[in-house]
């Protein structure tokens, strides 16, 4: 099936670019219906415009609370015809208003091997803890902070001379591939969502017929 995507960004939009490039190359059966940024100057908006994708700026500062901000996002996404939402460097915590409008159809890419190092500055957290391997995770979004069901992960070794900047750039390259990998699997019908069986439970997700991870990055350094 062709995925109708709404992509939410806050910055440079490199993961958005990976999606656009994969679509253009015929590697991803999807259409980006709308790119929304909460920041007017986000460079990712230019990436979308260059690809002929509609854009919108919806500032969180123009809304009194998170719920009303998310309601504005839902309205714009619905009008554009999006049925899946990708948080691609979107630096806002979403609420049930957005999640209920797109049940089990909101994805996020996070720069760690969750559940390790959730929240902001995951790369710095990895370095501070002295781990030897970190990476990135694509997961469905739920009401928690980076706690939703994991769809796929890719590992990146932490090198002895890594700085936060160097590690971040190497993880980012893996993010691009992993996000496209997961979206392509969803488009191919390999995503199964099992609804929660109790109020306290949460949805269980399976990606079937495809690898759940892209493996460990290799390096010649």
Where do the model's predicted regions map?
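N-terminal glycine-rich "phosphate-gripper" loop used for MgATP/nucleotide binding
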Residues: 37-38, 61-62, 66-67, 80-96
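Short, surface-exposed acidic-centric catalytic microdomains
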Residues: 30-68, 72
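Residue-level detector of anion-binding/catalytic polar loops
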Residues: 54, 83, 132
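Donor/substrate-binding cores of folate-linked one-carbon enzymes
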Residues: 22, 88-202
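N-terminal Rossmann-like dinucleotide-binding module
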Residues: 1-43
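Conserved acidic residues
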Residues: 33, 83, 104
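An anion-binding loop in the catalytic cleft
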Residues: 1-4, 27, 57, 160, ...
């Amino acid at each position: 099936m062709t995925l109708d995507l709404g992509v939410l960004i806050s910055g440079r939009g490199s993961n958005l670019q990976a999606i656009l490039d994969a679509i253009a190359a015929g590697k991803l059966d999807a259409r980006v219906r709308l790119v929304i940024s909460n920041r007017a100057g986000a460079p990712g908006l230019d990436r979308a415009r260059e690809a002929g994708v509609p854009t919108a700026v919806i500032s969180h500062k123009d809304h009194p609370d998170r719920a009303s901000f998310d309601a504005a996002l839902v309205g714009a996404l619905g009008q554009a015809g999006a049925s899946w939402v990708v948080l691609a460097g979107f630096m806002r915590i979403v609420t049930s208003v957005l999640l209920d409008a797109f049940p089990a159809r909101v994805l996020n890419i996070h720069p760690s091997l969750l559940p390790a190092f959730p929240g902001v500055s995951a790369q710095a957290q990895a370095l501070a803890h002295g781990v030897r391997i970190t990476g990135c995770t694509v997961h469905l979004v739920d009401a928690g902070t980076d706690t939703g069901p994991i769809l796929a992960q890719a590992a990146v070794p932490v090198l002895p001379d890594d700085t936060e900047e160097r590690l971040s750039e190497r993880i980012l390259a893996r993010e691009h591939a992993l996000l496209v990998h997961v979206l392509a699997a969803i488009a191919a019908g390999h995503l199964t969502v099992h609804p929660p069986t109790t109020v306290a439970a949460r949805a269980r997700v399976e990606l079937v017929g495809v690898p759940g991870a892209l493996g460990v990055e290799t390096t010649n350094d």
